[in-house]
Amino acid sequence: MSTGQPAHNTGVADDPEVVRRALLTRGWYRFGYDSTLADWVSAVIPHARAIADDPAARHAWLRCGGTWFAGVNILPNAPDGSLPAIGDRPAVPPLQGRAIRFLRETMGHGALPLDRAQLSICYPGYPAAPQPDESEAAFRYRRNRDAAHVDGLERDAARNRRLGEAHAFILAIPVAEAGPEAAPFTIWEGSHEIMRTAFRTRLTGLPREAWSQQDVTAAYTTARREAFESCRRVTLSAAPGEAYIAHRLSLHGVAPWEATAGPGAWRPIVYFRPELPALPDGTPDFEAWLSLP
């Protein structure tokens, strides 16, 4: 619907009820500066730099012609977000602040353990080139549609999409200054409800234990097309000490790094995407994934 507009909050001092309404309506919220979170970021920066400079990590995770370090679950944090001191890198305290407190207290995630965080880094020129296994059409989608996706979907051997992981939320924490045109996070407002309806319609009437085996490709691509046509695309950027959350069902991606973005050398973001508590048999709780606010 829109080619992209910078995001603006309407809440005052991140009031929990204002944040909740925004998250459930728009599918995102950006928190203002938080000194407690800023302290966590300051401690984690040396760890992020060490990971980004590690040759083995770069070999494993550098993508798109050297302009994207994917870094999935690469930060060795404990379930509370803390890290021990490693060499000359300081210990990182447990993750605290308004954003994680909102998710725990207002959204009901309580003591849900955090996953090992993703360290996603974009560099000038992203995306410079396709990945080795990326088709021309897929690369065009990356450039023109921000590689927009819903987290938790997986592809099987036939490249069909299935439910794979039941995330609770997406919490994004920038760890360095970067301009708003330096490969910002993008999200289609309200797309989470389009996706919820699409997946619910596709899976209604099927036993819960069969949900993860269903091909949801057609439902997903149709819902994605609807979101592109009817939802406002907004760009989200934030400074260290700020954070933003995205609804787990939202359609989101990363915009290209614009030539006007300025001289910044990197755009690193730490993402926490913990999974909802599993069912007694250890499988993901996709019913909760679809039903929770």
Where are the predicted features?
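Fe(II)/2-oxoglutarate
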Residues: 1-43
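Intrinsic-disorder/low-complexity, polar/charged segments enriched in Ser/Thr/Lys/Arg/Asp/Glu/Gln
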Residues: 30, 168-170, 233, 243, ...
